[in-house]
């Protein structure tokens, strides 16, 4: 597991929110290029490696992670030198206050900032209790004396603010705590998939990579599926674990078979294919029906694309400290590799046989 943790640490500590995925894209391009026939981007910056099949009428199978994590963008510099920001992606306001972040200026200068909070001493007039903060009311503080000093460091509206967090192992060495597993899980998964298939001749043309701007409305998936026109779309994404709250999604219990979420209902034949494949491969899996992934956008593009998500769950996602099991990654990895190898023309036609 040490080698896997090192890979996880490297990729989760990269910084990149929607619209600013360039660090992840550069890393991803370097990792995937040796294992594919060609690398292409879409008009928003999604990056995909293509392995061409030698077979006529080979189906086009798209495997897509997303590069972006949640963060913030500076909207205003106040006269006192603190910063207002808008959320890029979904945030629970309760997890934002008193956390360390990194602000990146236009010239890529990294500036440490913290998110503001109200100490209990200032709440005593309100019976000592704090009201629920609103995301838009939270300020970011870099210790600047005033607006002029903040601007002298190159800070302007539009600069990005990203959680500062180091990836660590839990005491039992089975789990990781980090930021951005949603969705660096997917980026690492696709990288490992392409490496494992380096010497394989597939019965499909594989288009594997990562979209941009998933966290702000599944935007990249709409562009990439239009460009690459897949017959089958497999999102690779991380979802919230509900095990602490007695809900679906338990860490350590394997990959997720997501038969429903508010943006996507899995087709019957796709569900049958996934269950049969998981059982034949001996993959540990669990059922899941929450959240949302790029499959929600992809399945509606072109004339309709059968889609699903190959995922894992993690506790406390969209925060500085997400906790997840490395074995779940390995189960999902085995599942995805088996799926991709099985998706030949007859299997794809069966899934699409209405």
Which role does the model predict for each range below?
Residues 1-354:
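N-terminal hydrophobic/helix-forming segments and targeting peptides
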């Amino acid at each position: 597991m040490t080698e896997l943790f090192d890979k996880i640490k490297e990729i989760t500590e990269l910084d990149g929110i929607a619209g600013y995925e360039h660090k992840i894209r550069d890393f991803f391009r370097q990792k995937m290029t040796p294992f594919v026939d060609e690398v292409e981007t879409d008009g928003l910056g999604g990056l995909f490696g293509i392995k061409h099949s030698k077979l006529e009428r080979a189906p086009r199978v798209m495997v897509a992670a997303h590069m972006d994590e949640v963060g913030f963008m500076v909207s205003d510099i106040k006269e006192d030198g603190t910063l207002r920001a808008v959320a890029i992606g979904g945030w629970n306001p309760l997890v934002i206050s008193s956390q360390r972040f990194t602000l990146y200026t236009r010239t890529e200068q990294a500036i440490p900032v913290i998110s503001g909070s109200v100490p209990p001493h200032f709440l005593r007039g309100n019976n000592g209790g704090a009201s629920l903060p609103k995301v838009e009311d939270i300020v970011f503080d870099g210790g600047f004396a005033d607006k002029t000093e903040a601007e002298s460091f190159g800070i302007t509206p539009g600069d990005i603010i990203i959680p500062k967090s180091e990836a660590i192992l839990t005491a039992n060495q089975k789990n990781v705590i980090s930021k951005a597993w949603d969705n660096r899980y997917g980026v690492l998964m696709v990288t490992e998939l392409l490496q494992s298939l380096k010497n394989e001749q597939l019965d499909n043309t594989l288009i594997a990579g990562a979209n941009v701007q998933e966290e702000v409305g599944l935007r990249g998936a709409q562009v990439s599926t239009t460009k690459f026109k897949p017959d089958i779309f497999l999102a690779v994404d991380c979802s919230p674990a509900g095990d602490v709250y007695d809900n679906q999604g338990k860490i350590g219990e394997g990959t997720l078979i997501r038969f429903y979420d508010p943006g996507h209902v899995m087709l019957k034949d796709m569900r049958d294919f996934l269950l049969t494949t998981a059982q034949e491969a001996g993959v540990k899996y669990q059922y899941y029906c929450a959240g949302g992934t790029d499959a929600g956008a992809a399945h509606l593009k072109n004339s309709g694309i059968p889609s699903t998500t190959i995922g894992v769950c993690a506790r406390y996602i969209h925060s500085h400290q997400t906790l997840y099991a490395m074995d779940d990654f390995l189960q999902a990895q085995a599942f995805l590799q088996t799926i991709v190898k099985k998706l030949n023309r007859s299997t794809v036609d069966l899934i699409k046989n209405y």
